[in-house]
Amino acid sequence: TEATSPFFRPIKYSLFPPLGLATLAGYLPPDAQVTIHDEHVEPLALDDDTPDLAVIQVYITNARRAYALADAYRRRGVHVALGGLHVTSLPEEAAAHADTIFLGPGEDTWPRFLDDFARGTAGAVYRSTTRTLATLPPVRRDLLKRHLYLVPNSIVVSRGCPHVCDFCYKEAFFAGGKGFYTQAVDAALAEIDRLSGRHLYFLDDHLFGDRRFASALFAGMRGMGRLWQAAGTVNAVLTPGLLEQAVEAGLRSLFVGFETLSPANLTAQRKFQNMKRDYAAAVRRLHDHGVMVNGSFVFGMDDDDPSVFDRTVEWAIGQGIETATFHVLTPYPGTALYQRMEAAGRLRHRDWDLYDTRHAVFQPARMSPEALEDGYWRAYREFYRWTSIARGAAAHADLAGALRHAAYAAGWKKFEPLWDLVIRARRTAIMLPVLESILSECGRRDAGRPPAPYSTRGRAPLGTRPLESLGANAADAGYGSASVV
């Protein structure tokens, strides 16, 4: 996995357990001997490991290690199956290291494969065409080592996303069928009921993507006493009524894909759901309801020049955004962005280890690759400076909001070495009460800012304002390295 890479960050890949593998395990009969290995949190010893079947979930930055594991198992005569985002994008590459590959999601193909494997007739390629979660079994959380993860209560109640952004990996993964679909609400609520503790993290690319489903889910969660985090779009935040329902159900922090402050970039990347949306109004609306904001921003789009880093950071600080996640634009194989970059000769290499949103793997239009990488790191440094955290906290209307901002922003980045130490010492469980304590203080509305129905009156939409005035995929988050059956 990426755990063997020099670029590995424990805090990123030790957040969530590998739900994809635990979901596949739910389809197996009760008497099957199943072990889930996640090299992000503990090494895998191959010496005495010779199962009947090894299933490895592959994403781009773990591909090198995943293929090495697959080759090692095959040399021992183990049947190896590979699936995941990277396999679907580059099936010929993956097939060289596997007996079976899965293209697309596995809800329809995995049960067919299990029947074929039991009969000794397993195929080489299984391609998903039927998209439904109607027969999804409960996730085998009993196979996960919860104490090794910072956020053990992660959950996914939908697949895909209703939008078609050019840079998103998920477009390739869900090609050939529905790109967005959900569980039945009752099934989702039952899965939530099976989780202990108060805190939840929805890993769905867009929990608000189907308004009818989201509304029913939030109604069902009222009274559960849960505190939860999720991802949503600017458009969803500005939709009257839906945010209020989410907050009443326990929403305390939202990952929002702002991505860019440039209307030209939004158009080029087909991020139409953000066009002519008032970003500042979305942040105010979340803060008015006591919801913390984790803003996502992507650098390196064609309208970006070297000034984009300072402008973006200043905007985020000025809005009082609690945490920001910055990315270098990365053309993942299988995406429309990759195809454009390849056709234009702008790809610098195909070293998948470096396709990690931290390295410039293409030639930017208006700056050098080195300037793009330097600006990315500078953005992180500037946003998380103590003075910047203080300025962001001061943007809140009340003392409680300012203190929450300071605690969350500082706790997440300024103490990352401490988090890494806790992870390596396998003491992550002691940090969950800290997270729940911070989140329990959210949901309290800023003093002097009673929420009102959203109105655009007097506020110019993004597309008409000057720039001064941005999954999978958590695409990669939540995927483990190997399931041995």
Predicted region positions:
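Acidic, low-complexity intrinsically disordered segments
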Residues: T1-R194, R366
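Structural detector of well-ordered beta-strand residues that form the stable sheet scaffold
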Residues: A81, F102, V125-Y126, Q229-A231, ...
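Structural recognition of alpha->loop->beta junctions
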Residues: E93-P111, Q245-F255, R311-F326
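Radical SAM enzyme core and accessory elements
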Residues: I36, F117, K145, R346, ...
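Radical SAM [4Fe-4S] cluster-binding motif and immediate context
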Residues: P138-N294, M301, P306-D310, E314
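Flexible glycine/acidic-rich beta-alpha junction loops that bind and position SAM and/or redox cofactors
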Residues: T1-A3, P91-E93, R212, A264-Q269, ...
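A structural motif corresponding to the C-terminal end of an alpha-helix
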Residues: L24-T35, L195, A282-V293, Q319, ...
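Alpha-helical structural signal in soluble globular domains
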Residues: Y27, D31, A72, R76, ...
